[in-house]
Amino acid sequence: MNQFNKVCVIGLGYIGLPTAAIFASRKIKVIGVDINQNIVDIINKGKIHIVEPGLDILVHMVVNDGYLKATTLPEEADAFIIAVPTPFKGDNHEPNLDYIEMASKAIAKVLKKGNLVILESTSPVGTTEQMAKWLAEERSDLSFPHQCGEVSDIKIAHCPERVLPGQVIRELVENDRIIGGMTQKCAEYAIRLYKIFVQGECIMTNARTAEMTKLTENSFRDLNIAFANELSILCDKLDINVWELIKLANRHPRVNILQPGCGVGGHCIAVDPWFIVYQNPNEAKIIKTAREVNDNKPNFVVQKIKKKIKDILGPKIACLGLAFKPDIDDLRESPALDIVIKLASENASQILVVEPNIKQLPLKLQNKRNIKLVCLSQALDEADVVAVLVRHKEFIEVQSDKVVSFC
């Protein structure tokens, strides 16, 4: 029954589009769904709207070969993969599951007995079960795992992605995959689907554990980054070179301190720990503290830069990089973007932004009169102070006495 000839992927962003393209490259018919008509049109021309090495070639091939088609509405398929955003509601870090609910209701209309539905979106514990309830509300003619267990008409699983931006194509194929079924049979169905392209091990568990696994992975990484960032703040106060300190401490055979930076960004590490904290505010104390340390690091960077320009009349500040990590165009939760916004609020300063992976400033910056997107050479020539916020490959060789060390 679970022969996967056609897969429908909901959400064609940084995870959904690569996933759709890889399935299509294995000669599976793929329907990619996105509510943004512009994205749909771009993909159907065999082009891409994001920066990810190798993805442009892959999408061009599978679209031309007829295995990938983009549309704004779901179609009947054997398996459905939901890969939509899970942002926050307001300032209290409440998870916003609206996109998952909308995606669930959209695919419910075309579900048929024997289908598999997979939630890939990183989600708070219990979201997969909630998704099953949303589907059941829309389709009373079908049975779901929370109602009928192993004999349900529809199989449901949570299978979180765990890939590195810039290495997505390779890691989707090579990385181990956590497969969290609402029942064992649900997990078995999902493993068969992912084994179409996954060369790593597919490890079976339940949906709630799979949800918590992804949140735990990113919380662990956040904690380690917070330790490095807190060290950089302490060393600044104590007049110690943090880079030398970490290098020496790491000579201990059981110590591996990470490198500090200007904060933590992206839609994983900067977001996922808050899902744990929101559901468990009294227990997740260390996780919360780490988030606060990393969220506050941009303020520390801003103060360092302001100290450097305090005696300059009408200073020009070059900010190199806006993305949340090197060599990508993803600005979600970027600490570099936060730093630029804070600096721009000091109206006496002009900000020269260099971001080689975008063609125009994001909307948050477009209404700021004292911010310009410029090339690297112009920024280095005109700026009084240079802050390398993101170590894009274009910036690695930058050497200037104007560069501010903020760690």
Curated annotation (Swiss-Prot):
Which reaction equations make up its catalytic activity?
UDP-N-acetyl-alpha-D-mannosamine + 2 NAD(+) + H2O = UDP-N-acetyl-alpha-D-mannosaminouronate + 2 NADH + 3 H(+)
- UniProt entry tagged with the keyword Cytoplasm: no
A Pfam match: UDPG_MGDP_dh_N
Top EC class of this enzyme: oxidoreductase
Question: What EC identifiers does the entry list?
Answer: 1.1.1.336
**From the UniProt record, which GO molecular function terms apply?**
NAD binding; oxidoreductase activity, acting on the CH-CH group of donors, NAD or NADP as acceptor; UDP-glucose 6-dehydrogenase activity
Q: Cross-referenced InterPro entries, in alphabetical order?
A: 6-PGluconate_DH-like_C_sf, NAD(P)-bd_dom_sf, UDP-Glc/GDP-Man, UDP-Glc/GDP-Man_DH_C, UDP-Glc/GDP-Man_DH_C_sf, UDP-Glc/GDP-Man_DH_dimer, UDP-Glc/GDP-Man_DH_N, UDP_ManNAc/GlcNAc_DH
The lineage's top-level taxon is Bacteria
Give a short account of what the protein does. Dehydrogenase involved in the biosynthesis of capsular polysaccharides. Catalyzes the NAD(+)-dependent oxidation of UDP-N-acetyl-D-mannosamine (UDP-ManNAc) to UDP-N-acetyl-D-mannosaminuronic acid (UDP-ManNAcA).
> Could you tell me what this protein is called?
UDP-N-acetyl-D-mannosamine dehydrogenase
Which organism's genome codes for this protein?
Answer: Campylobacter jejuni
**Originating gene:** HS11.16
